[in-house]
C-alpha cells in the first residue's frame, strides 16, 4: 500500500504568486477543500522551522469527534518559489507531511500537491487512519488554489494534457 499521494495541476499563474499564497497561514485556510481548517494565525513563513497556528474542526471528515482544536504547522522544507512542506504538531505529533512543488511551464506553473505519511509510526498506520485526506481533497485544493491566484483563467497546456 502506498504511503504517499501526489496530484498535479497546471495553473495559469506565476510560481511566485502561488508561493505567496502557500506561505501565508490564511492562504492555507482559503484554499483548503477538506473543511477542517477554520482559521489561522501567524505571519507568513520564510524559513524551515517557522510555525503558525491553525484552528481546526474535524467535523467535516465525520470520523473522529475531536471538536474544535488547534495545531501548529511547522515548515520542514522551504525553497522559495519552488517547494514548501510542513508537518502538523498538536494533540498528536504523527509525522505526516504535506507539501507543494512548483515548476514553471509555458503560461503558468505546474503545481504538485503531496501528502506523505511514510514516517508515521507503524501503530498509527495499523489504526487505518491514513491517509487522513483523500486524493480527491488534494485535487480539489489545487482547483481552489487555481481559482484564488488565476480566477477565470484557463489552465495552461501540459505534456500530459
Residue locations for each model-derived region?
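Hydrophobic beta-strand positions in extracellular immunoglobulin-like domains
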Residues: 11, 58, 115-117
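Intrinsic-disorder/low-complexity, polar/charged segments enriched in Ser/Thr/Lys/Arg/Asp/Glu/Gln
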Residues: 2-8, 51, 70, 83, ...
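Hydrophobic ligand-binding cavity/cleft-lining segments
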Residues: 1-47, 161
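Hydrophobic/aromatic beta-strand elements that line small-molecule binding cavities or substrate pockets
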Residues: 7-9, 70-77, 88, 96-104
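A short, structured loop/turn motif at beta-sheet edges
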Residues: 12-16, 43-48, 76-82, 101-110
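Beta-strand/loop substructures that line and gate deep hydrophobic ligand-binding cavities in soluble
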Residues: 85-140, 156-157
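Glycine-rich portal/gate segments that line the openings of hydrophobic small-molecule binding cavities
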Residues: 40-89, 144-158
Amino acid at each position: 500500500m502506498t504511503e504517499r499521494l501526489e496530484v498535479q495541476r497546471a495553473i495559469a499563474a506565476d510560481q511566485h504568486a502561488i508561493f505567496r499564497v502557500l506561505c501565508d497561514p490564511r492562504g492555507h485556510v482559503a484554499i483548503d477543500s477538506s473543511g477542517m481548517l477554520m482559521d489561522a494565525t501567524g505571519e507568513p513563513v520564510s524559513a524551515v522551522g517557522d510555525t503558525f497556528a491553525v484552528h481546526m474542526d474535524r467535523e467535516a471528515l465525520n470520523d473522529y469527534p475531536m471538536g474544535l482544536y488547534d495545531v501548529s504547522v511547522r515548515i520542514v522544507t522551504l525553497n522559495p518559489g519552488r517547494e514548501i512542506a510542513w508537518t502538523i504538531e498538536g494533540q498528536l505529533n504523527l509525522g505526516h507531511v504535506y507539501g507543494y512543488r512548483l515548476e514553471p511551464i509555458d503560461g503558468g506553473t505546474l503545481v504538485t500537491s503531496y501528502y506523505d505519511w511514510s514516517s508515521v509510526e507503524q501503530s498509527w498506520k495499523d489504526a487505518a487512519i491514513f491517509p487522513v485526506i483523500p486524493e480527491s481533497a488534494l485535487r480539489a485544493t489545487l482547483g481552489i488554489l487555481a481559482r484564488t491566484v488565476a480566477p477565470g483563467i484557463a489552465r495552461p497546456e501540459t505534456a500530459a494534457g
